[in-house]
Amino acid sequence: MAKKGKKYQESAKLIDRTVEYKLDEASKLVVETAKAKFDESVELHAKLGVDSRHADQQVRGTIVLPHGTGKDQKVAVFAKGEKAEEAKAAGADFVGAEDLAEKIQKEGWLGFDVAVATPDMMGVVGRIGRILGPQGLMPNPKAGTVTMDVTSAIKEIKAGKVEYRTDKSNIIHVPVGKVSFGEEKIAENINALMQAILKAKPASSKGKYIRSLTIASTMGPGIKVNPLQFAKE
C-alpha cells in the first residue's frame, strides 16, 4: 500500500489543483500520471447544475464514443425464439428468458456489463429489477436497451456505446477510454461525450449547467478540466 501511495503522490505533484486545464493538457496529464502496471481506465466526472430529484431535470442519454471504451462489454439479452437467435448471431454473450432470470435470482449471478431485453420480456426482467436496478443493469427504453432491434443494440454496445446519467448528487460518471489510447483519442472521446451532455441540457435547468469537470485514471489523481471550452454558457 505504501508503494501505491508513493506513486500517487508523485503523480499528484505533476498537477496544479488550482487550475482548470484545457482538454488537450488534461488528457496529456491523465496519461502521464497513470503509474499502475495495468492499463488503467480513464473516467470523466461532470457535476451538473440540475436537481435530479425533479424528473424534468434528470440528464440521461447514450453515445457511441468515437474510439470506444477499450473494454469488452459482456452483453446479456433477454429474448425468445427468433429474437434470441438474432441476439446470438449479433454476438451476445448470454441469451435466455426465464432461465436467465432464474440464474440471476437464485445464484446472484451478474456476469455481464449490459442487459438488453425485448419489450415482451420486461415482465420477466421486472421480477429481478431489485437485483439489476442497484447495479445499473436494468434494461431501459431511454438507453436503447429495451428494443426489438436486438442486433443494433448489441453492435452499438460492443462498439463502445456508453450511458450517461446523473446520480443523486447530480454528477455524471462515464468511462472514456484506457490510458493506452493516448491523449488524442481520450480527448476526442471526452469532447464527443461533452457535446452529448450539453445537448441533453434540460429546458428547466437555470444558471450554470456544467459546474465542474474532472478526469482521472483508475489509480491516478483527479485533473480539473475547464468546462467553458466546450460551449459558452
Curated annotation (Swiss-Prot):
Disulfide cysteine pairs (residue numbers): none
Gene3D superfamilies assigned: 3.30.190.20, 3.40.50.790
The organism's taxonomic lineage, starting at the top: Bacteria, Bacillati, Bacillota, Tissierellia, Tissierellales
Keywords associated with the record: Repressor, Ribonucleoprotein, Ribosomal protein, RNA-binding, rRNA-binding, Translation regulation, tRNA-binding
Gene behind this protein: rplA
Record-linked InterPro entries: Ribosom_uL1_bac-type, Ribosomal_uL1, Ribosomal_uL1-like, Ribosomal_uL1/biogenesis, Ribosomal_uL1_3-a/b-sand
Claim: Repressor is one of the keywords in the record: yes
Name of the featured protein: Large ribosomal subunit protein uL1
Family: Belongs to the universal ribosomal protein uL1 family.
GO molecular function terms listed in the Swiss-Prot or TrEMBL record: rRNA binding; structural constituent of ribosome; tRNA binding
GO biological process: regulation of translation; translation
NCBIfam families: rplA_bact
Keyword RNA-binding listed: yes
Taxonomic superkingdom: Bacteria
A GO term from the CC aspect: large ribosomal subunit
